[in-house]
Amino acid sequence: ANNFPTQEPAAQCGMRNAECGIENGHSELRTPNSALEQAQRVNETAASRTIGVTIETRPDYVDETEIRRLRELGVTRVELGAQILNDRILELIVRDHTTAEIRHATQLLRDAGFKVAYHLMPNLPGATPDDDLASCRALFEDPAYRPDTLKLYPCVVVKSAELYQWWQDGRYQPYDDETLVELLIAMKRLVPPYARIERVIRDIPSTSIEAGSKRTNLREEVQRRMRARGLACRCIRCRQVRDGEPGTFTLTRRDFEASGGQEAFLSFEDAATDRLACLLRLRLPSTLRNRHPHWMPVLEGAALVRELHTYGHHVGIHQRADDAAQHRGFGKQLIEEAERIARQEWGCQRIAVIAGVGARE
């Protein structure tokens, strides 16, 4: 396996109007005079480790040069501010990027092994609930998108934004809570089992919101109504195992096209309870699938493991707990299956694994 070695000198942390912030409680990474490479080496074997780094950026900022810099920084996941898959509305809100740039950024990031998350913002100016639902439907029906994770941030009005004036002038009117909750229920029903909804509301104090939903328990209300109607969200967050949950887990495979390449979503799931214990995202890059040279030579000819994650409560390194999903061999079995698929089905001679610095030991 190849843990995405860096061949260039470490870059400084700062990315064209995008802030690279590493939030951690690890003193090993907070030493003021430590060079990035030295801090990364220390973190590989530290008692407390940073095992992944996520950054947020705009789709139009993503190019091959930027991606190389993200690799140097140890980034493992990139969140794109997609907002809505509708060029008319993106132009209206002066977003200054297009859906074509969202698709291009997604393909570059996937082919470099990153996990990809989207931010969607229902209730933007010019949008209707039907527009928002169509955007969510396209998100997973169109293979040019299909993100791994999703954050839903319904639009609200704050005084510091230009939208505040639009609202005062009557040019913008947010959805009422009833409309918003029903829209979110419909959106959650569209999300496939390989994707994860991480957020359903943004943490903005209700005292700062002039218009729009001020409900801090929006996700809970959506889930309550879905349960009352016998509906279930099948996103990963709603299905992942909780502390101490028993289960009989079997290896499950889902294949789908994405960004010009092929994805195999491998997982250990309990069919009876629809719980998920462990997952692996394996990718045949678009370059390899279409017999083109990879623009990143270190990944030439390799299938990519973009994520390996076991859920449940944390178990220490080299430890085991009978009531936990971690350290039961699920991850090892998924890696072995990924190697088999890459070698026997896709004709790849090697696998490259993107891993957080603290997960490489």
Segments from the language model and where they lie:
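C-terminal accessory regions of radical SAM enzymes
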Residues: 171-289
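Conserved active-site alpha-helix within GNAT-family acetyltransferase domains
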Residues: 357-361
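Short, basic, low-complexity termini and linkers enriched in Ser/Thr/Gly/Pro
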Residues: 10-34
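Conserved acetyl-CoA binding element of GNAT-fold acetyltransferases
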Residues: 299-326
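Conserved beta-strand positions in the central sheet of alpha/beta enzyme cores
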Residues: 79, 151, 304-306, 352
